[in-house]
Amino acid sequence: MKGLYFQQSSTDEEITFVFQEKEDLPVTEDNFVKLQVKACALSQINTKLLAEMKMKKDLFPVGREIAGIVLDVGSKVSFFQPDDEVVGILPLDSEDPGLCEVVRVHEHYLVHKPEKVTWTEAAGSIRDGVRAYTALHYLSHLSPGKSVLIMDGASAFGTIAIQLAHHRGAKVISTACSLEDKQCLERFRPPIARVIDVSNGKVHVAESCLEETGGLGVDIVLDAGVRLYSKDDEPAVKLQLLPHKHDIITLLGVGGHWVTTEENLQLDPPDSHCLFLKGATLAFLNDEVWNLSNVQQGKYLCILKDVMEKLSTGVFRPQLDEPIPLYEAKVSMEAVQKNQGRKKQVVQF
């Protein structure tokens, strides 16, 4: 049985993906479930986080968002039985790669998959669903009538976040990084209040948002990375179409919430003072926290269930690429790690 793993060279950040033979799994332990994987979604690997967690291994397993059929359960498993269809996210310290035919996983990382939902949809939207819930429900308390700016709304994550915001009755503004993205966002139903095309670099995001909200500013901003410095000091790659942190602070309304994905965000005293005057809050979106601490395991499982329910009722309509077979996973994973794809890539078994 083959599984996909990655190796990190000691000198630099470069990682290489390798298929490795894996011995057959032993008898299932107490609280563990043995799964036959039907689909596994590909996501970027946060090597920095793994290093900070002091997880030193020669080979790290690849692929964490999985959907599959229960083959066997341990003696203390209470939620599942053989032949159940399940979906979940493997923890960071999982021994088994999701990109493998059979895996072992603790029952507290899984929920039942509704019949209506396909394997690829389940695996392809579980992680983005968790991220959207974390950002909009737990970090910014989304409620009907609020205005939400979702940066890069045509990305796989942006799409789910927009659909969740619309479902909760919020007014959504979004940015598009290309003409294709703009057309995609304009086709959304219910319609997005305003699509800001930032591809030519001439449109000012803050001005557009203030205009749309009658000068009041938006209640919630969900960014997709920000520029920390002026154009001359920022590396060229980083420059591409990202808003400056001052723009985001400017367009935030009184009592607004800024949810950022920029882990190295630095705010100067004048920035902090401006946020203080607005009574605004800043939150960091790290969806791994649910799996790094078991304190809120119940909440986490409720989120997973809710994401599946919204998939089955058509609230979530994920942007998925054509499913690929396992033997193409290595090449696809290299592209995903370089952040080259727009739609979510899913391996189907």
Curated annotation (Swiss-Prot):
Is the keyword NADP assigned to this protein?
A: yes
Q: How does it assemble?
A: Homodimer. Component of the FERRY complex composed of five subunits, TBCK, PPP1R21, FERRY3, CRYZL1 and GATD1 with a ratio of 1:2:1:2:4, respectively.
* Subcellular location, principal: other
Q: What is this protein called?
A: Quinone oxidoreductase-like protein 1
The GO terms this record gives for MF are: identical protein binding; NADP binding; NADPH:quinone reductase activity
Concerning its family, UniProt says: Belongs to the zinc-containing alcohol dehydrogenase family. Quinone oxidoreductase subfamily.
The EC number(s) this enzyme carries = 1.-.-.-
- Which enzyme type, at the first EC level? oxidoreductase
What is the annotated tissue distribution of the protein whose record heads this document?
Answer: Ubiquitous.
Biological process terms from the Gene Ontology for this record are: quinone metabolic process
GO cellular-component terms in the record? Answer: cytosol; early endosome
Subcellular location, record wording: Early endosome
What's this protein's function? Component of the FERRY complex (Five-subunit Endosomal Rab5 and RNA/ribosome intermediary). The FERRY complex directly interacts with mRNAs and RAB5A, and functions as a RAB5A effector involved in the localization and the distribution of specific mRNAs most likely by mediating their endosomal transport. The complex recruits mRNAs and ribosomes to early endosomes through direct mRNA-interaction.
Q: Name one Pfam family in it.
A: ADH_N
Q: Which domain of life is it from?
A: Eukaryota
Looking at the keywords, is Flavoprotein present? Answer: no
SMART domains, alphabetized: PKS_ER
Give the UniProt keywords, A-Z. Answer: Endosome, NADP, Oxidoreductase
Which residues, by range, are in coiled-coil regions? none
